[in-house]
């Protein structure tokens, strides 16, 4: 079974269950290098209830996004959480991630809310190696899986990060 089929199967299983009380936790982070713009676009997809639970455990703050009544500085806490749990190095150099925007969508299958975080890294002319450390939600959920899809140098790579292995490196030759 190839990775794409496995991801689709896992997504169907997850999305067809009650996500407020589930045993399997998933996030998807996509990194896409745009050579023309010299940027690395980053999109993170998280279930809002899981993100809110993690932020509550870490900061003691209830964001209220799940209940459609977000607190005034909810986006600040989301940014802070992402910056403290997602780290990238390109060509063996740590890079600065810039937060662009946050979107909330409801999934059609289960009507659960998903948060999309758009970020970017500027001035990336070429990528010979990339290191990703993704600790999103790992401290809150033992079965958390963080799928990272990387599109760089015409190659698509997929990482499956979890509590045991939260960091991986890819070298392009």
Label each PLM-derived region with a short phrase:
Residues 4-15:
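Sec-dependent N-terminal signal peptides
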Residues 17-21:
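Sec/Tat signal peptide C-region and signal peptidase I cleavage site
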Residues 22-173:
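N-terminal soluble domains immediately following signal/targeting peptides that reside
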């Amino acid at each position: 079974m190839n990775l794409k089929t496995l991801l689709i199967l896992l997504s169907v299983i997850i999305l067809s269950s009650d996500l407020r009380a589930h045993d399997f936790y998933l996030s998807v982070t996509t990194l896409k290098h745009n050579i023309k713009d010299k940027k690395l676009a980053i999109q993170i997809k998280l279930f809002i209830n899981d993100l809110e639970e993690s932020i509550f455990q870490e900061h003691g703050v209830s964001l209220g996004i799940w209940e459609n009544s977000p607190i005034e500085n909810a986006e600040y806490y989301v940014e802070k959480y992402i910056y403290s749990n997602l780290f990238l190095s390109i060509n063996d150099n740590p890079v600065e991630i810039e937060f662009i925007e946050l979107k909330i969508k409801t999934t059609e299958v289960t009507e659960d809310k998903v948060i999309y975080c758009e970020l970017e890294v500027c001035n990336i002319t070429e990528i010979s190696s990339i290191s990703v450390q993704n600790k999103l939600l790992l401290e809150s959920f033992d079965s958390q899986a963080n799928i990272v899809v990387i599109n760089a140098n015409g190659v698509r790579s997929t990482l499956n990060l979890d509590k045991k292995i939260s960091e991986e490196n890819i070298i392009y030759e």
